[in-house]
Amino acid sequence: MSSPDGGYASDDQIHGNCSVPIMMGQYEWTDPLTMFQDAKTKKEAGSANSRGKAEARIRRPMNAFMVWAKDERKRLAQQNPDLHNAELSKMLGKSWKSLTLASKRPFVEEAERLRVQHIQDYPDYKYRPRRKKQVKRMKREEEGFLPSANLAGPQVMGCNAMVGQNYKMQYSGQNSQQSQITPAGYFEDHNPVGYYYRGYNVSKYYMSQNSSGYCSPPAQGEYQALSYNFNSSYMPYQQNASTPAMGKQMAVKENIIQESPEHGIMGCQVSPQMYNGQMYVPECAKTHPVAQTEQHSSSHQSQQMVTQNYLPSQQDGHLESDIDKTEFDQYLMYEPKSDTELIYTIDQDSGAYSTNLLPSLISEANSVCYYDYCGV
């Protein structure tokens, strides 16, 4: 019968020997314990070299505190074995400060003797402080996050210049588009000038400063479009223009409105509102006949203001010569009048409109031209 292992290891099992050392005898086998012993000897040799380097380094001479703390630290360590070295140093510092000069004198003399001896032993000694490796590592890490100095040359400046040029081109294109097309809500975000402001006394500059949002004056194209929209939007009210014969009827209706108790509420509602040259009339005021007459006259006055801004200088000089200088005194005093009294002056004898309104319109047009186009 054949053996179960095929006759390969029958002799080894009988004699109790392994065939691996015989087959691989050419390789060197080492004991694991010898490896650890070799590592231990190398470590001891390295520590001996480090000790030799430390001993080769010249130490500084001890001062008086070090001479005193040399023996005192050992005593405190024996009394308080659980304390850390930092706590021992704090205790030594406090106790050294509490000592008197007489008790410190022997330690000071010993430190002076050691210093003289150190100078004699090492005449070429120069104190070199230890380098702080941790601070150096932190500096290197911080320098890794900072950009290099080479990038701060003309390349970066060129990139910044290109970015600035692109931004300027884009911004100029946006400004040109905005100047060509006026937004729909351009005249909607401004506070109205109604009953509490007198148009001939308060300039647009100061009214814009008092308002919540300040906006620059419109361009010339916007001003022309404004005048066109103004004329086209108030055509129905111009058709209802009153004749001089309607003056007395309007005066009677005005007295009725002033005597009514609802005049305090309707005074501000019926008054037209001005938005940077546009006249805004409330819905409740469109049905009232007196309000329609006021709308027509106020629109006519605003149209005269716009057209007088473009008159030649010769015509302006001719019109300014006709201004009565004493008439401006009445504008300096504020009198709470109704809107009809501010807009109209009716001759009681003839019932027709007086022509004293022309100088005030001229002065108002000049002030509008000065504040809108001179940039004050």
From Swiss-Prot:
Residues annotated as DNA-binding are 58-126
Q: Which Pfam families match?
A: HMG_box (PF00505)
* An MF annotation (GO) of this entry: DNA binding
Q: Which residues form the Sox C-terminal domain?
A: 259-376
Q: For the region Required for transcriptional activity and interaction with ctnnb1, what residue ranges are annotated?
A: 327-331
> Oligomeric state and partners?
Interacts (via C-terminus) with ctnnb1/beta-catenin (via Armadillo repeats); this interaction is required for inhibition of wnt-signaling.
Q: Which GO terms describe its biological process?
A: gastrulation; Wnt signaling pathway
Residues forming the motif 9aaTAD are 326-334
Question: Could you tell me the keywords of this UniProt record?
Answer: Activator, Developmental protein, DNA-binding, Gastrulation, Nucleus, Transcription, Transcription regulation, Wnt signaling pathway
Q: Where is the protein localized?
A: Nucleus
- GO (cellular component) term, any one: nucleus
**What organism is this sequence from?**
Xenopus tropicalis
> SMART domains from the xrefs?
HMG
The role this protein plays is: Transcription activator. Doesn't appear to bind to the consensus 5'-AACAAT-3' DNA binding site, but binds 5'-ATTGTT-3'. All of the sox17 proteins are required for embryonic endoderm development and gastrulation movements, and show some redundancy in function. In addition, the sox17 proteins have distinct but overlapping roles in later gut development. Acts downstream of vegt-signaling in endoderm differentiation to induce a range of endodermal genes both directly and indirectly. Also represses wnt-responsive genes to inhibit wnt/beta-catenin-mediated signaling.
Presence of keyword Transcription regulation: yes
Q: Which InterPro entries match?
A: HMG_box_dom (IPR009071), HMG_box_dom_sf (IPR036910), Sox_C (IPR021934), SRY-related_HMG-box_TF-like (IPR050140)
> Looking at the keywords, is Amino-acid biosynthesis present?
no
User: What note about domains is in the entry?
Assistant: The 9aaTAD motif is a transactivation domain present in a large number of yeast and animal transcription factors.
Q: What is the lineage of its organism?
A: Eukaryota, Metazoa, Chordata, Craniata, Vertebrata
Major site of localization recorded for this protein? nucleus
Q: What is this protein called?
A: Transcription factor Sox-17-beta.3
Q: Which Gene3D superfamilies match?
A: High mobility group box domain
- Source organism superkingdom: Eukaryota
